[in-house]
């Protein structure tokens, strides 16, 4: 049973559920990570996967940016491939490479051999979420998972990929195997996120990091039904839900259809927008009543304060126009994760600026 808190004053929860926030809410994807010296010091003692599966460490890393910045939400420290590891997939996260899968999944037999999520294997992640709920006070906690397509991409390609050739070939040449794989990954994603919801997270975000590699036709045929099933299942639990991908301008409408498949009135459905698409354009593409999140270019943070201030003001103004055009709300974020070279002091000033506008 969920232990979610009642946080009526949260600007983040107000914006994602279509209510007027007291200020423009802001948080950053990868706000906990390599841009923080305290994170780098901790990671000298723990590998990425070890940190994800050690509750005290995951809790500490999640809290580090909350102590530094006046952000309006925390996001649980974990990794997209954690549920794959919890389903018995032999993988590692290699520095400067990313997730590497020992035995890629490329045949019907490979798909049939896949195991479901082991509930006991994700207990450390859920313990971390429970610890954070107790620590965060009035700051909401966002849980997250990778979307089925992005998990499939890692599994089929064997790691990060520029062209996603193997995954597209499987999708087009072996559609039965593809949909069987996606069905298993959808079940896994639902189980992982429901566990986080039951542990007390206040919202969830589903990252489809590689969806931008697909055409709108292929996305609708091979991905949308599975992503929609994730959100439909989560919608029964009454938490706000965000769907985010990179390079997805032409997919925003379909992605909003997925996230609103599980939306209940007043619960909140959000689509994340990267820096390539103006928020006002995104508002015209998504299902009416969907909130938007984004979308400062992460590289702008490296460009010096005058450039940061100009760009941030432009994003806030664009967000207000998007709301006027029908978006349910706007949450300020970067259009992707914080870059490792980012100066924490600049991010702190950016939060203060956004809150002042």
Curated annotation (Swiss-Prot):
Keyword Cytoplasm attached: yes
Regions crossing the membrane: none
Major location category of this protein: cytoplasm
Reaction(s) catalysed by this chain's protein: uroporphyrinogen III + 4 H(+) = coproporphyrinogen III + 4 CO2
Gene3D superfamilies, alphabetized: 3.20.20.210
GO biological process, alphabetically ordered: heme biosynthetic process; protoporphyrinogen IX biosynthetic process
Binding site for substrate: 30-34, 79, 154, 209, 336
One Gene Ontology term of the molecular function aspect: uroporphyrinogen decarboxylase activity
Pathway, per record: Porphyrin-containing compound metabolism; protoporphyrin-IX biosynthesis; coproporphyrinogen-III from 5-aminolevulinate: step 4/4
Keywords: Cytoplasm, Decarboxylase, Lyase, Porphyrin biosynthesis
SUPFAM superfamilies: UROD/MetE-like
Record-linked InterPro entries: UROD/MetE-like_sf (IPR038071), Uroporphyrinogen_deCO2ase_HemE (IPR006361), Uroporphyrinogen_deCOase (IPR000257)
Residues the record marks as site: Transition state stabilizer: 79
One cellular-component annotation, GO: cytosol
EC number(s) on file: 4.1.1.37
Subcellular location: Cytoplasm
Note: Was identified as a high-confidence drug target.
Record family assignment: Belongs to the uroporphyrinogen decarboxylase family.
Cited HAMAP family: URO_D
Subunit structure: Homodimer.
Main function: Catalyzes the decarboxylation of four acetate groups of uroporphyrinogen-III to yield coproporphyrinogen-III.
The protein, known as: Uroporphyrinogen decarboxylase
